[in-house]
Protein backbone atom coordinates (compact mmCIF):
# COMPACT_ATOMS: atom_id res chain seq x y z
CA UNK A 1 0.00 0.00 0.00
CA UNK A 2 1.28 3.44 -0.95
CA UNK A 3 1.25 6.13 1.78
CA UNK A 4 -1.23 8.16 -0.27
CA UNK A 5 -3.50 5.17 -0.90
CA UNK A 6 -3.06 5.53 -4.66
CA UNK A 7 -2.83 2.58 -7.02
CA UNK A 8 0.68 1.81 -8.27
CA UNK A 9 -0.18 3.20 -11.72
CA UNK A 10 -2.08 6.27 -10.50
CA UNK A 11 -0.97 9.87 -10.94
CA UNK A 12 -1.52 12.47 -8.25
CA UNK A 13 -4.21 15.07 -8.88
CA UNK A 14 -2.94 17.30 -11.67
CA UNK A 15 -3.93 20.94 -12.12
CA UNK A 16 -2.66 23.69 -14.41
CA UNK A 17 -3.38 27.42 -14.19
CA UNK A 18 -2.34 29.45 -17.25
CA UNK A 19 -1.41 33.16 -17.12
CA UNK A 20 -0.58 32.77 -13.44
CA UNK A 21 1.69 35.82 -13.42
CA UNK A 22 1.06 39.16 -15.11
CA UNK A 23 4.32 40.06 -16.83
CA UNK A 24 5.82 36.92 -18.38
CA UNK A 25 5.01 36.08 -21.99
CA UNK A 26 4.06 32.60 -20.80
CA UNK A 27 3.31 31.57 -17.23
CA UNK A 28 1.83 28.49 -15.62
CA UNK A 29 1.23 27.22 -12.10
CA UNK A 30 1.43 23.44 -12.25
CA UNK A 31 0.36 21.21 -9.38
CA UNK A 32 1.03 17.50 -8.99
CA UNK A 33 -0.72 16.76 -5.71
CA UNK A 34 1.04 18.90 -3.11
CA UNK A 35 3.97 19.76 -5.39
CA UNK A 36 3.44 23.23 -6.83
CA UNK A 37 5.74 25.00 -9.30
CA UNK A 38 5.47 28.37 -11.03
CA UNK A 39 6.91 28.11 -14.55
CA UNK A 40 7.46 31.23 -16.64
CA UNK A 41 8.76 31.65 -20.18
CA UNK A 42 10.26 35.08 -20.91
CA UNK A 43 11.17 36.21 -24.42
CA UNK A 44 14.37 38.27 -24.57
CA UNK A 45 15.76 39.89 -27.72
CA UNK A 46 19.21 38.59 -28.65
CA UNK A 47 21.15 35.41 -28.05
CA UNK A 48 24.32 34.35 -26.20
CA UNK A 49 27.66 35.07 -27.89
CA UNK A 50 28.05 31.52 -29.15
CA UNK A 51 24.77 31.91 -31.09
CA UNK A 52 25.46 35.41 -32.43
CA UNK A 53 24.79 35.80 -36.18
CA UNK A 54 23.74 32.15 -36.42
CA UNK A 55 20.17 32.98 -37.33
CA UNK A 56 19.07 30.73 -34.49
CA UNK A 57 17.52 31.49 -31.15
CA UNK A 58 18.27 29.92 -27.78
CA UNK A 59 16.40 28.44 -24.85
CA UNK A 60 17.77 28.20 -21.34
CA UNK A 61 16.35 27.35 -17.92
CA UNK A 62 16.77 28.26 -14.28
CA UNK A 63 15.34 26.36 -11.30
CA UNK A 64 14.96 27.26 -7.66
CA UNK A 65 13.08 26.40 -4.49
CA UNK A 66 11.56 28.87 -2.07
CA UNK A 67 13.08 28.64 1.42
CA UNK A 68 9.96 27.12 2.97
CA UNK A 69 8.87 25.01 0.02
CA UNK A 70 10.19 22.05 2.01
CA UNK A 71 9.44 20.62 5.47
CA UNK A 72 12.31 22.55 7.05
CA UNK A 73 13.34 26.02 5.94
CA UNK A 74 16.48 26.19 3.84
CA UNK A 75 18.58 29.24 3.04
CA UNK A 76 18.21 30.82 -0.37
CA UNK A 77 21.04 29.87 -2.69
CA UNK A 78 21.49 33.57 -3.47
CA UNK A 79 22.20 34.18 0.22
CA UNK A 80 24.75 31.36 0.22
CA UNK A 81 26.34 32.80 -2.90
CA UNK A 82 26.44 29.48 -4.72
CA UNK A 83 24.07 27.14 -6.48
CA UNK A 84 24.07 23.54 -5.32
CA UNK A 85 25.09 20.74 -7.64
CA UNK A 86 21.49 19.50 -7.53
CA UNK A 87 20.16 22.84 -8.76
CA UNK A 88 22.67 23.00 -11.61
CA UNK A 89 21.87 19.44 -12.65
CA UNK A 90 18.11 20.11 -12.68
CA UNK A 91 18.54 23.35 -14.67
CA UNK A 92 20.54 21.52 -17.32
CA UNK A 93 17.94 18.75 -17.48
CA UNK A 94 15.08 21.22 -17.95
CA UNK A 95 16.96 23.14 -20.65
CA UNK A 96 17.94 19.99 -22.57
CA UNK A 97 14.43 18.58 -22.45
CA UNK A 98 12.80 21.76 -23.69
CA UNK A 99 15.32 22.59 -26.42
CA UNK A 100 14.36 19.25 -27.96
CA UNK A 101 10.84 20.60 -28.46
CA UNK A 102 11.57 23.93 -30.16
CA UNK A 103 12.85 24.76 -33.64
CA UNK A 104 15.38 27.39 -32.61
CA UNK A 105 15.77 28.64 -36.18
CA UNK A 106 12.07 29.49 -36.29
CA UNK A 107 12.24 31.92 -33.35
CA UNK A 108 15.01 34.03 -34.89
CA UNK A 109 17.76 35.47 -32.72
CA UNK A 110 15.63 35.59 -29.60
CA UNK A 111 16.11 33.78 -26.30
CA UNK A 112 13.38 32.04 -24.34
CA UNK A 113 14.33 32.03 -20.67
CA UNK A 114 12.55 29.51 -18.48
CA UNK A 115 12.21 30.06 -14.73
CA UNK A 116 10.89 27.23 -12.58
CA UNK A 117 10.24 28.25 -8.98
CA UNK A 118 9.10 25.57 -6.57
CA UNK A 119 6.70 27.07 -4.04
CA UNK A 120 5.81 23.75 -2.40
CA UNK A 121 7.74 20.50 -2.72
CA UNK A 122 6.33 17.02 -2.23
CA UNK A 123 8.41 15.00 -4.68
CA UNK A 124 8.74 15.26 -8.46
CA UNK A 125 9.69 18.94 -8.64
CA UNK A 126 11.97 18.52 -11.66
CA UNK A 127 9.42 16.56 -13.67
CA UNK A 128 6.65 19.01 -12.77
CA UNK A 129 8.97 21.85 -13.84
CA UNK A 130 9.56 20.32 -17.26
CA UNK A 131 5.86 19.74 -17.87
CA UNK A 132 4.82 23.19 -16.68
CA UNK A 133 7.60 24.91 -18.61
CA UNK A 134 6.54 23.20 -21.83
CA UNK A 135 3.06 24.66 -21.39
CA UNK A 136 4.54 28.10 -20.64
CA UNK A 137 6.66 27.94 -23.81
CA UNK A 138 3.58 27.25 -25.91
CA UNK A 139 1.89 30.30 -24.38
CA UNK A 140 5.00 32.43 -24.98
CA UNK A 141 5.17 31.40 -28.63
CA UNK A 142 1.51 32.32 -29.04
CA UNK A 143 2.30 35.70 -27.47
CA UNK A 144 5.13 36.20 -29.95
CA UNK A 145 2.77 35.54 -32.85
CA UNK A 146 0.08 37.86 -31.55
CA UNK A 147 2.57 40.68 -30.98
CA UNK A 148 4.34 40.54 -34.34
CA UNK A 149 7.51 38.89 -33.04
CA UNK A 150 6.81 35.83 -35.17
CA UNK A 151 4.89 35.26 -38.36
CA UNK A 152 1.44 33.90 -37.54
CA UNK A 153 2.15 30.91 -39.79
CA UNK A 154 5.40 30.09 -38.01
CA UNK A 155 5.44 26.87 -36.02
CA UNK A 156 8.50 26.78 -33.77
CA UNK A 157 6.96 24.19 -31.45
CA UNK A 158 8.06 20.78 -32.71
CA UNK A 159 6.24 18.96 -29.93
CA UNK A 160 5.11 19.30 -26.35
CA UNK A 161 7.13 17.75 -23.53
CA UNK A 162 6.05 16.09 -20.30
CA UNK A 163 7.94 14.26 -17.58
CA UNK A 164 7.12 11.99 -14.67
CA UNK A 165 8.89 10.09 -11.92
CA UNK A 166 8.64 6.34 -11.41
CA UNK A 167 10.37 4.09 -8.95
CA UNK A 168 10.40 0.93 -6.92
CA UNK A 169 8.74 1.34 -3.54
CA UNK A 170 8.32 -1.64 -1.20
CA UNK A 171 9.55 -3.87 -4.04
CA UNK A 172 6.83 -2.68 -6.43
CA UNK A 173 7.08 -0.33 -9.44
CA UNK A 174 5.05 2.83 -8.80
CA UNK A 175 4.15 5.97 -10.74
CA UNK A 176 4.54 9.62 -9.70
CA UNK A 177 6.32 9.35 -6.36
CA UNK A 178 5.53 11.82 -3.61
CA UNK A 179 8.10 12.78 -0.97
CA UNK A 180 7.31 9.92 1.42
CA UNK A 181 7.83 7.40 -1.37
CA UNK A 182 10.78 9.14 -2.99
CA UNK A 183 12.72 9.34 0.27
CA UNK A 184 12.25 5.61 0.88
CA UNK A 185 12.34 4.24 -2.67
CA UNK A 186 14.71 1.45 -3.68
CA UNK A 187 14.90 2.97 -7.16
CA UNK A 188 14.08 6.44 -8.45
CA UNK A 189 13.72 7.21 -12.16
CA UNK A 190 12.68 10.29 -14.14
CA UNK A 191 11.37 9.93 -17.69
CA UNK A 192 10.94 12.77 -20.20
CA UNK A 193 8.95 12.21 -23.40
CA UNK A 194 7.45 14.30 -26.17
CA UNK A 195 3.93 14.34 -27.55
CA UNK A 196 5.08 12.27 -30.54
CA UNK A 197 5.86 9.36 -28.22
CA UNK A 198 9.62 9.86 -28.38
CA UNK A 199 11.86 9.50 -25.35
CA UNK A 200 13.98 12.58 -24.58
CA UNK A 201 15.73 11.55 -21.39
CA UNK A 202 15.75 8.84 -18.74
CA UNK A 203 17.48 9.25 -15.38
CA UNK A 204 17.47 6.15 -13.19
CA UNK A 205 19.28 5.50 -9.93
CA UNK A 206 19.28 2.53 -7.58
CA UNK A 207 19.33 3.45 -3.90
CA UNK A 208 21.34 0.70 -2.23
CA UNK A 209 19.72 -2.10 -4.22
CA UNK A 210 20.02 -2.77 -7.92
CA UNK A 211 17.05 -3.18 -10.25
CA UNK A 212 16.56 -5.73 -12.99
CA UNK A 213 15.93 -5.20 -16.69
CA UNK A 214 12.41 -6.50 -16.12
CA UNK A 215 11.82 -3.93 -13.38
CA UNK A 216 13.23 -1.22 -15.63
CA UNK A 217 10.76 -2.21 -18.36
CA UNK A 218 7.87 -2.09 -15.89
CA UNK A 219 8.89 1.36 -14.66
CA UNK A 220 9.23 2.64 -18.22
CA UNK A 221 5.79 1.24 -19.03
CA UNK A 222 4.32 3.07 -16.04
CA UNK A 223 6.05 6.30 -17.11
CA UNK A 224 4.68 6.03 -20.65
CA UNK A 225 1.17 5.47 -19.28
CA UNK A 226 1.48 8.42 -16.92
CA UNK A 227 2.86 10.78 -19.54
CA UNK A 228 0.11 9.80 -21.97
CA UNK A 229 -2.43 10.74 -19.28
CA UNK A 230 -0.65 14.05 -18.67
CA UNK A 231 -0.84 14.95 -22.36
CA UNK A 232 -4.52 14.01 -22.44
CA UNK A 233 -5.26 16.09 -19.34
CA UNK A 234 -3.39 19.38 -19.66
CA UNK A 235 -2.10 19.80 -23.23
UniProtKB/Swiss-Prot annotation:
Its EC number(s): 2.7.7.56
Keyword annotations: Nucleotidyltransferase, RNA-binding, rRNA processing, Transferase, tRNA processing, tRNA-binding
Binding site for phosphate: 86, 124-126
GO molecular function annotation: 3'-5'-RNA exonuclease activity; tRNA binding; tRNA nucleotidyltransferase activity
Stretches assigned to coiled coil: none
Keyword DNA-binding: no
Entry-linked SUPFAM superfamilies: Ribonuclease PH domain 2-like (SSF55666), Ribosomal protein S5 domain 2-like (SSF54211)
Catalytic activity: tRNA(n+1) + phosphate = tRNA(n) + a ribonucleoside 5'-diphosphate
PROSITE patterns, A to Z: RIBONUCLEASE_PH
Top EC class of this enzyme: transferase
InterPro entries: ExoRNase_PH_dom1 (IPR001247), ExoRNase_PH_dom2 (IPR015847), ExoRNase_PH_dom2_sf (IPR036345), PNPase/RNase_PH_dom_sf (IPR027408), Ribosomal_Su5_D2-typ_SF (IPR020568), RNase_PH (IPR050080), RNase_PH_bac-type (IPR002381), RNase_PH_CS (IPR018336)
Origin superkingdom: Bacteria
A biological process from GO: rRNA processing
PANTHER family listed in its UniProt record: EXOSOME COMPLEX COMPONENT, EXOSOME COMPLEX COMPONENT RRP41
Role: Phosphorolytic 3'-5' exoribonuclease that plays an important role in tRNA 3'-end maturation. Removes nucleotide residues following the 3'-CCA terminus of tRNAs; can also add nucleotides to the ends of RNA molecules by using nucleoside diphosphates as substrates, but this may not be physiologically important. Probably plays a role in initiation of 16S rRNA degradation (leading to ribosome degradation) during starvation.
Oligomer status and interactors: Homohexameric ring arranged as a trimer of dimers.
Family note: Belongs to the RNase PH family.
Name the record gives this protein: Ribonuclease PH
Amino acid sequence: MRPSGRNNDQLRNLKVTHNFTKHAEGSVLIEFGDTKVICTASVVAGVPKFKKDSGEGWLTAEYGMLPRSTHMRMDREAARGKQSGRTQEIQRLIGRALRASVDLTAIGENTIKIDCDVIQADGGTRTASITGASLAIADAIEYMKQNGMLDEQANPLLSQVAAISVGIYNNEPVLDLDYDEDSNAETDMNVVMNSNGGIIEIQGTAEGKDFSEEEFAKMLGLAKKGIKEIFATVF
